């Protein structure tokens, strides 16, 4: 069994808000987002491996489509034809919802921009150099964090903790679950902040064999 599909829908709906994408719709036993962006046409997010995932993998034979699974990379690999290639691993995580506020380290300034349910935080040095940024979005069912990025030269200084704290202060519904998807490096940080991994998050696509240009 995969994770609760309602959690996936809540996260994916808020993620679409954060990125200005269409809301997810139910399709083939999964949730589909019609991204229609450079390099990506559509993506499907499955809660578990099922017959529809296998059938979809066999029916698609061109680049531009992403199949995502709240499950292991090995399970996704086994469900798809050989033309599909796995992406770098990621993890679906849930936050503590009651995290203590974290101060911004000396020498940095935060700027917060709110656009309806979406908030962006940018951290800069005294010289005005952008060194970290992140987004959050809130719906009735979830508060999600998205695109949390810190310049490698400024890591291990508490910027990640401060970023999450600043974004989290925009949350209105205190009981809503806090969700995000992270890389293995990010997972270690969030575990120290009290987050828990609820599932691996695996991705596959068919690579574009055309030469660039």
Kindly label every feature range from the protein language model.
Residues 1-77:
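N-terminal charged segments
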Residues 52-55, 150, 156-170, 192:
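Conserved acetyl-CoA-binding loop-helix of GNAT-fold acetyltransferases
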Residues 61-71, 170-183:
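Conserved GNAT acetyl-CoA-binding A-motif
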Residues 74-84, 161, 173, 184-201, ...:
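Conserved active-site alpha-helix within GNAT-family acetyltransferase domains
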Residues 80-120, 125:
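Acyltransferase donor/substrate-recognition loop-hinge adjacent to the catalytic core
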Residues 89-99, 181-184, 200-213:
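C-terminal "cap" of GNAT-fold acetyltransferases
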Residues 113-151:
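A conserved beta-strand-loop-helix scaffold within acyl/acetyltransferase catalytic domains
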């Amino acid at each position: 069994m995969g994770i609760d599909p309602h959690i996936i829908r809540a996260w994916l709906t808020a993620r679409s808000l954060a990125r200005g994408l269409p809301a997810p719709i139910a399709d083939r036993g999964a949730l589909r987002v019609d991204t229609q962006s450079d390099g990506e046409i559509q993506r499907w997010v499955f809660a578990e491996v099922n017959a529809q995932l296998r059938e979809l993998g066999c029916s698609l034979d061109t680049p531009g489509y992403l199949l995502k699974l709240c499950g292991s990379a090995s399970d996704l690999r086994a469900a798809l034809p050989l033309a599909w290639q796995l992406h770098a691993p990621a993890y679906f995580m849930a936050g503590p919802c009651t995290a203590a506020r974290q101060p911004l380290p000396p020498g940095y300034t935060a700027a917060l921009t709110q656009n309806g349910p979406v908030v962006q935080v940018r951290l800069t040095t005294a010289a005005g150099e952008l060194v970290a940024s992140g987004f959050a979005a809130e719906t009735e069912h979830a508060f999600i964090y998205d695109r949390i990025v810190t310049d490698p030269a400024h890591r291990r200084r508490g910027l990640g903790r401060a970023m999450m704290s600043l974004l989290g202060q925009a949350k209105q519904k205190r009981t809503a679950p806090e969700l995000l998807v992270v890389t293995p490096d990010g997972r270690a940080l969030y575990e120290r902040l009290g987050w828990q991994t609820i599932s691996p998050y695996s991705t596959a696509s068919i690579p574009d064999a055309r030469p660039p240009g």
